[in-house]
């Protein structure tokens, strides 16, 4: 103590602001990477739904790594084999609708994630005898995702079934049921959604054809 009652101890130096800022930057970068990774995984899952519903081979293949495995109901084997099996079925124009909810992503490291997503699937089409069947399926996709060269895809999938309900298909034709509600969904490449990408390509290649030349009318 000095004569004025003060302390002779040296004041505590403030923390280095540069270290604090560096730490914050690192945390922000990790958070942003985490968000990007989560969104990439969700996008892959949603792309799978389009691929299976539209029988879009390119979309389906973009969801799995080449060495991926798929345990999918009665099918168990390579993902490539499942894709071919699905295309053989769904290219025959059945009604097929997949929806996803409750997507839970648990990272096992920087390049692996365990992902559970709930699905609801309504499928309607001909069986092996030619009879029309309709079934409502509910369950979960239990997926192991891997990130390779910056891209997330499925390396292992197990489909868990929680609900199966066979339904009586309507007797009326699609033309009668849909009536004026047009257009209706179709397999790749005939579904209207693919026109959107065509227009985007056209806009890049020939922007003036879509937005005008910019010249005043005479």
Curated annotation (Swiss-Prot):
Keywords: Plasmid. Signal peptide: none annotated. Residues 15-24 have a biased composition (Polar residues). It comes from the Bacteria. Residues 1-24, 169-218 are annotated as: Disordered. The keyword Acetylation does not apply. Residues 169-179 have a biased composition (Basic and acidic residues). The keyword Ligase does not apply. Gene3D superfamilies: 3.10.450.50. This is Uncharacterized protein y4vH. It comes from Sinorhizobium fredii (strain NBRC 101917 / NGR234).
